[in-house]
């Protein structure tokens, strides 16, 4: 039996809350980078961060946009006699300023972590009630990014107003330092963060922590994918669980403030290649931050070629900054081993008049899937230009780096990295305006009015397209 869900505006308060421009001038596109938590947790050190940054640079990923190196929890040894945070000298013998300087000298940006609670999630000193001195500590150490968690919050949650003011205290403190610091809330979507986050932050988590599973339910992530207002977010949430929770929230994100679906799990667990190929572009098209959660020293060629797919990254970094919308969703009978099975179509506008389209197969078998211009341009009126024009179809995975080339790059063949897009030399915005072919995939056909876009999508896989007005 099929169940059909069409997008509604039943929870939209955009007219009330809106999506304002960046509150601090940062986050004009979703942030990209690397965070140690998903792979290394508390096993952190100065050497890990600097070696990882060097490897990201060598692989050409820094120049593709992965510039934030984010140090997560477990870096502190407490506070000094003046109440300021102190870095663990065993893990960071040269101090945080040394780490920041090394990263800055190599064109990276430095991120650190704290929690809006008495303690961090791993039990280290938190910043609740200490916002001004801790913000000054981060500024003094030339930090460019703060991930701000939600553990040990002393019960200061339960309404949007309570959570808003708890997180605004750090926002104000960061601004007071005078240093531009990207502010990333990690409050798990508690108290409807997507309604109020854009006024005080550049991104906000909208669910419990991710795990490297495509559909597997977990009792530690108690809310299913339809519960966007989850009272207990938990953790070990699957990719599809988080994606479905995010579906109604795109209307409350945009330039300067982004829904954060959590770090990328490409090469973190045992996802299949098709699952990784679906995970990455779905995060990209809903304009989630693209934060690598893997050990970059153990990337497989197939995973590397996903992280380095410029035509997908260009969707995420599109200057229009509008998250894609889930247009339809069906449950299907061919469920997987966890009893999960559904198919979806997502669509969204891009800056240059193009449109991004995804056909997502969450079922257990490959299946034919299709869509039409009426579905793709779901907000257009009958007879509008979008519905009466012919569109060229570009497959955004068609020019994926092959395993041989990826292996050469991973083996530090500097010549091989020359094929990669370099966003340091030419921004994605400029590359799109100049029609750089690396950002558009490969043309595979056209879609005329009243025609149907047909394709076969693998199990737990995706068909991912950019539509361009036909010449």
From Swiss-Prot:
EC number: 3.2.1.22
SUPFAM superfamilies: (Trans)glycosidases, Glycosyl hydrolase domain
Annotated S-S bridges: 42-74, 121-151, 221-237, 223-230
Molecular function in Gene Ontology: alpha-galactosidase activity
InterPro entries from the UniProt entry: Aldolase_TIM, Glyco_hydro_27, Glyco_hydro_27/36_CS, Glyco_hydro_b, Glyco_hydro_melibiase, Glycoside_hydrolase_SF, Melibiase_C
Binding site for substrate: 72-73, 147, 205, 251
UniProt keywords, alphabetically: Disulfide bond, Glycoprotein, Glycosidase, Hydrolase, Secreted, Signal
GO CC annotations on file: extracellular region
Subunit structure: Homotetramer.
Name of the molecule in the record: Alpha-galactosidase 2
Origin organism lineage: Eukaryota, Fungi, Dikarya, Ascomycota, Saccharomycotina
